[in-house]
Swiss-Prot record:
S-adenosyl-L-methionine binds at W139, G165, S166, G167, W228, A247. GO terms for biological process: methylation. Interacts with EEF2KMT. Belongs to the class I-like SAM-binding methyltransferase superfamily. EEF2KMT family. SUPFAM superfamilies: S-adenosyl-L-methionine-dependent methyltransferases. It is an enzyme of class 2 (transferase). It comes from Homo sapiens (Human). The modification N-acetylmethionine is found at M1. The lineage of its organism: Eukaryota, Metazoa, Chordata, Craniata, Vertebrata. One of its GO terms (molecular function) is protein-lysine N-methyltransferase activity. One of its GO terms (cellular component) is protein-containing complex. This is Putative protein N-methyltransferase FAM86B2. Its EC number is 2.1.1.-. Keywords: Acetylation, Methyltransferase, S-adenosyl-L-methionine, Transferase.
């Protein structure tokens, strides 16, 4: 295989691997590129490699997605193969049969591969979906912020980090594994999301602060219930963060006002210490919402500047979405 062709195949396999482990929508997979390669070769090795990068991946075997998702993926893979080759590939049907025989769990997993060779895995109970929270979803801005953090570890090394609206915990878990913070505080107002967060912290080999058997080389990790509207200075002063982060929390005008308010109270808690650095990442869905955020910041005397856009390198998120991140000075 020519070097250019080999590089293209590796890129294709990586695309399938990262999207499948992260349980991205099937339409986001590089199906057209796969079909083109299948037409150019009668060899079934590529499909076998895709199976090893997806349903047979060690991370998937340990922390599988839902049976339904795996079945839909394999069905689509078989369809693409049959559209090009008349001879069926027994291995595809064997794996599909194994998937159909598997018992559906109440937990589904999404995994994100890290540049260190490790991964972050999120376990999500289907029971949470019906309770009206957004914490079950891993928003694209959380992936964008996590990727930025991994590229800029100096912002977090040996520092105390407070995350507002942690949701499933992807960003914080990536920072804890890759950026060596001294302490990390996950926070969210919803009790069901907090329960999920604690489970994901433990699932990824980290210990909660109350666990005296924790790894001394790992950051001190806390999961805190924090409602921006009712949190008083005495509660916020216990955190004493050096860095505050938030991703995709600008979803309505009320949330924006609440966010700016809690940031002001956090700054007041630092007394004679330097105010924390603040990074807020978001997907630009509605320019008016972004304008409202910067207007509210200006009204409260909070300066801001946009961080330079970074290219997608590690995590699979919407390629055509407009992402932004602001660095705030409290």
């Amino acid at each position: 295989m020519a070097p250019e062709e080999n590089a293209g195949t590796e890129l294709l396999l990586q695309g399938f691997e990262r999207r499948f482990l992260a349980v991205r929508t099937l339409r986001s997979f590089p199906w057209q590129s796969l079909e083109a390669k299948l037409r150019d070769s009668s060899d079934s090795e590529l499909l076998r490699d895709i199976l090893q990068k997806t349903v047979r991946h060690p991370v998937c075997v340990k922390h599988p997605p839902s049976v339904k998702y795996a079945w839909c993926f394999l069905s689509e893979l078989i369809k693409k193969h049959e559209a090009v080759h008349t001879e069926p590939l027994d291995k595809l049907y064997e794996v599909l049969a194994e998937t159909l025989m598997a018992k559906e769990s109440t937990q589904g997993h999404r995994s994100y591969l890290l540049s260190s060779g490790g991964s972050v895995t999120l376990s999500k109970s289907t029971a949470i979906i019906s309770h009206g929270t957004t914490g079950l979803v891993t928003w694209d801005a959380a992936l964008y912020l996590a990727e930025w953090a991994i590229e800029n570890p100096a912002a977090f090394i040996n520092r105390t980090v407070l995350e507002l609206g942690s949701g499933a915990g992807l960003t914080g878990l990536a920072i804890c594994k890759m950026c060596r913070p001294r302490a990390y505080i996950f926070s969210d107002p919803h009790s069901r999301i907090l329960e999920q967060l604690r489970g994901n912290v433990l699932l990824n080999g980290l210990s909660l602060e109350a666990d005296i058997t924790g790894n001394l080389d790992s950051p001190r990790v806390t999961v805190a219930q924090l409602d921006w509207d009712v949190a008083m200075v005495h509660q916020l002063s216990a955190f004493q963060p050096d860095v505050v982060i938030a991703a995709d929390v600008l979803y309505c005008p009320e949330a924006i006002v609440s966010l700016v308010g809690v940031l002001q109270r956090l700054a007041a808690c630092r007394e004679h210490k330097r105010a924390p650095e603040v990074y807020v990442a978001f997907t630009v869905r509605n320019p008016e919402t972004c304008q409202l955020f910067t207007t509210e910041l200006g009204r409260d005397g909070i300066r801001w500047e946009a961080e330079a856009h970074h290219d997608q390198k590690l995590f699979p998120y919407g390629e055509h979405l407009e992402m932004a991140m602001l660095n705030l000075t409290l």
